[in-house]
Amino acid sequence: MSSKRLAVLEKMTAAGSKDPFAWYGLAMEYSGLGRTDDALATFEKLRALDASYVAMYLMCGTMLAKAGRVDDGRAWLESGITAATAKSDGHALSELQDALAGLG
């Protein structure tokens, strides 16, 4: 993980960026650093900004499940299935369904 990339993304989002990829990137940086709570808070901000940004649901759901927060992860994956269905995103839908099935 690049501390420079993290700093740039933190600056962009703190300045009120509406770019969903900036928020997604920041959440992924936090996740990669093991900062699960920061990542979750950032994913939640992204969901408030753009609930149709389907990629966040898979990444947040699997991150939470890996952190032992399986019920929270399941809820994110289920929300992602709804979002992917609404966007007719079959590829994302398949990945989300597979991830959900993997939780048991």
Regions found by a protein language model. Give the residues of each.
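Conserved structural position within tetratricopeptide repeats
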Residues: 11-14, 44-48, 82
